């Protein structure tokens, strides 16, 4: 029969998850190892996290010490689970929708996958990507640090007032 990506995702136990963050926070940190990450401002007062095609029990969303923490790194993974033979599984995507505020710090770390930051305002912005494209659109801040090992870097309407540090390998 024809290839069915949805059934393949089910066989790999991939799930879609949705979180609504009700606790207040002034900074955020998102750590992922294999997903496309999109962080964008929204015109609502509610912060939401949507994760698609994620292995079960691999994403945790908490607020600790006024910081939103999103951890999308599997806790116990065997070395051979990082390799996929044959057809690749559907791409995981994490979308964080933030209320339109000025945040103290926005920190994104991703091993494999694209990082997109849209319409976000923060004092300190820190982005680290090992493999994937980094795209910033309509960003303002005091300081910005971007490390991108493999992949393209796109900056559109980015205004940093004090210091910008970009490392592109």
Predicted feature residues:
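Acidic (Asp/Glu) and glycine-rich low-complexity loops/linkers
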Residues: 1-31, 36-110, 116-128, 135-148, ...
């Amino acid at each position: 029969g024809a290839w069915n990506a949805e059934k393949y995702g089910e066989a790999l136990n991939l799930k879609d998850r949705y979180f609504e963050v009700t606790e207040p926070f002034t900074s955020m940190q998102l750590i992922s190892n294999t997903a496309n990450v999109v962080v964008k401002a929204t015109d609502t007062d509610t912060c939401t996290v949507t994760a698609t095609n994620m292995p079960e029990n691999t994403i945790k969303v908490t607020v600790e010490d006024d910081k939103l923490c999103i951890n999308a790194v599997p806790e116990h993974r065997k070395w051979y689970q990082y390799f996929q033979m044959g057809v690749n599984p559907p791409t995981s995507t994490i979308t964080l929708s933030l209320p339109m505020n000025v945040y103290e710090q926005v920190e994104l770390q991703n091993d494999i996958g694209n990082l997109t930051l849209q319409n976000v305002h923060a004092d300190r912005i820190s982005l680290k990507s090992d493999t994937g494209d980094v795209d910033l659109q309509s960003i303002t801040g005091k300081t910005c640090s971007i490390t991108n090992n493999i992949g393209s870097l796109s900056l559109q309407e980015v205004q940093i007032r004090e210091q910008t540090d970009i490392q592109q390998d």
